[in-house]
């Protein structure tokens, strides 16, 4: 089951958030977003500094799992971060995050002449296409 998705710009601002199957609602969504970004920033820095080998896109951090959720992570070359939170039993969604970026975000946000890079995403076509993509996934509501 997929709980929610976050998209952060390179400066750490959450430019898109949506939840579907999240049972516990946040008291302060803005604070949660800052905590999530800070945790990811620190985790990536720790992994990079403690790894005995050079970290790259294929071998770097892409998910972690607790007893209550799994965090799936993809960072683009332009430092846009895509995060999906799911049930811990959902398989790795890294390829799905890459598709969301390349086939949906790039097509309906980046190529949109009205969109200002780094600002909140409000494009209805993007939101509709993202929802269509996620809701057709076997792990969306299972």
UniProtKB/Swiss-Prot annotation:
By its UniProt entry, which SMART domains does this protein fall under? Sybindin
Kindly list the residue ranges recorded as spanning the membrane: none
UniProt cross-references to Pfam families, sorted A to Z = Sybindin
InterPro entries reported in the protein's UniProt record = Longin-like_dom_sf, TRAPPC
UniProt xrefs under Gene3D superfamilies: 3.30.450.70
Cellular localization per UniProt:
Golgi apparatus, cis-Golgi network; Endoplasmic reticulum
Q: Offer a single GO CC term for the protein.
A: Golgi apparatus
Per the record, the GO terms for biological process are: endoplasmic reticulum to Golgi vesicle-mediated transport
| Known partners and oligomeric status | Part of the multisubunit TRAPP (transport protein particle) complex.
Described by its record, this protein's role is as follows: May play a role in vesicular transport from endoplasmic reticulum to Golgi.
State what protein this is by name.
Trafficking protein particle complex subunit 1
Q: Which organism is it from?
A: Dictyostelium discoideum
Which gene specifies this protein's sequence?
Answer: trappc1-1
């Amino acid at each position: 089951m997929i709980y929610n998705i976050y998209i952060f710009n390179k400066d750490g601002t959450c430019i898109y958030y949506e939840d579907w199957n999240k049972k516990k609602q946040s008291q302060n969504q803005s604070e949660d977003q800052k905590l999530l970004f800070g945790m990811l920033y620190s985790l990536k820095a720790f992994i990079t500094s403690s790894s005995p080998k050079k970290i790259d896109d294929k071998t770097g951090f892409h998910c972690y799992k607790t007893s209550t959720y799994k965090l799936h992570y993809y960072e683009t070359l332009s430092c846009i971060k895509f995060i999906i939170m799911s049930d811990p039993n959902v398989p790795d969604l890294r390829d799905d995050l890459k598709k969301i970026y390349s086939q949906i975000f790039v097509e309906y946000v980046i190529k949109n002449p009205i969109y200002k890079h780094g600002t909140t995403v409000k494009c209805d076509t993007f939101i509709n296409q993202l929802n269509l993509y996620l809701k057709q996934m076997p792990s969306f509501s299972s």
